[in-house]
Curated annotation (Swiss-Prot):
It is found in: Secreted. Heterohexamer; disulfide linked. Contains 2 sets of 3 non-identical chains (alpha, beta and gamma). The 2 heterotrimers are in head to head conformation with the N-termini in a small central domain. GO terms for biological process: adaptive immune response; blood coagulation; innate immune response. A long coiled coil structure formed by 3 polypeptide chains connects the central nodule to the C-terminal domains (distal nodules). The long C-terminal ends of the alpha chains fold back, contributing a fourth strand to the coiled coil structure. This is Fibrinogen alpha chain. GO terms for cellular component: extracellular region. It comes from Felis catus (Cat). Cleaved by the protease thrombin to yield monomers which, together with fibrinogen beta (FGB) and fibrinogen gamma (FGG), polymerize to form an insoluble fibrin matrix. Fibrin has a major function in hemostasis as one of the primary components of blood clots. In addition, functions during the early stages of wound repair to stabilize the lesion and guide cell migration during re-epithelialization. Was originally thought to be essential for platelet aggregation, based on in vitro studies using anticoagulated blood. The keyword Metal-binding does not apply. The gene is FGA. Its main location: secreted. Keywords: Adaptive immunity, Blood coagulation, Coiled coil, Disulfide bond, Hemostasis, Immunity, Innate immunity, Secreted.
């Protein structure tokens, strides 16, 4: 996603 935690890069970036 954008500024979320727990999502992968394939989700839309924002791995932090």
């Amino acid at each position: 996603g954008d500024v979320q935690e727990g999502e992968f890069i394939a989700e839309g970036g924002g791995v932090r």
